[in-house]
Amino acid sequence: MLGQSIRRFTTSVVRRSHYEEGPGKNIPFSVENKWRLLAMMTLFFGSGFAAPFFIVRHQLLKK
């Protein structure tokens, strides 16, 4: 009796918790606009790549 009610509860929870599915729906940013995505990825990866160079430049120019 208890097992059946638990099983019914878990299946009803799964049925009620439906999210959108498909490509690009399970990531925290939008992939609908490819140019905006390109700009955001360039900023994200470019800032990580450029940071050491700016740090070294700052250290070399510091008195």
UniProtKB/Swiss-Prot annotation:
InterPro entries linked: COX7C/Cox8 (IPR004202), COX7C/Cox8_sf (IPR036636)
Pfam families for the chain: COX7C
Stretches assigned to the Mitochondrial matrix side: 17-33
Membrane topology: Single-pass membrane protein
UniProt note on tissues of expression: Liver, heart, muscle and brain, contain the same isoform of COX VIIc, but at different concentrations.
Residues carrying N6-acetyllysine: K25
Residues that bear N6-succinyllysine: K25
This protein's pathway: Energy metabolism; oxidative phosphorylation
Keyword vocabulary terms for this entry: Acetylation, Membrane, Mitochondrion, Mitochondrion inner membrane, Transit peptide, Transmembrane, Transmembrane helix
Mitochondrial intermembrane topological domain residue ranges: 61-63
Protein localization: Mitochondrion inner membrane
Bilayer-crossing regions: 34-60
GO cellular component, as recorded: mitochondrial inner membrane; respiratory chain complex IV
Transit peptide, UniProt annotation: 1-16
Domain of life: Eukaryota
Protein transport is among the record's keywords: no
Any GO BP annotation: mitochondrial electron transport, cytochrome c to oxygen
CDD domains: Cyt_c_Oxidase_VIIc
Family per similarity comment: Belongs to the cytochrome c oxidase VIIc family.
Subunit record text: Component of the cytochrome c oxidase (complex IV, CIV), a multisubunit enzyme composed of 14 subunits. The complex is composed of a catalytic core of 3 subunits MT-CO1, MT-CO2 and MT-CO3, encoded in the mitochondrial DNA, and 11 supernumerary subunits COX4I1 (or COX4I2), COX5A, COX5B, COX6A2 (or COX6A1), COX6B1 (or COX6B2), COX6C, COX7A1 (or COX7A2), COX7B, COX7C, COX8B and NDUFA4, which are encoded in the nuclear genome.
Known function: Component of the cytochrome c oxidase, the last enzyme in the mitochondrial electron transport chain which drives oxidative phosphorylation. The respiratory chain contains 3 multisubunit complexes succinate dehydrogenase (complex II, CII), ubiquinol-cytochrome c oxidoreductase (cytochrome b-c1 complex, complex III, CIII) and cytochrome c oxidase (complex IV, CIV), that cooperate to transfer electrons derived from NADH and succinate to molecular oxygen, creating an electrochemical gradient over the inner membrane that drives transmembrane transport and the ATP synthase.
Protein name stated in the entry: Cytochrome c oxidase subunit 7C, mitochondrial
The species this protein was found in: Bos taurus
Taxonomic path: Eukaryota, Metazoa, Chordata, Craniata, Vertebrata
UniProt gene name: COX7C
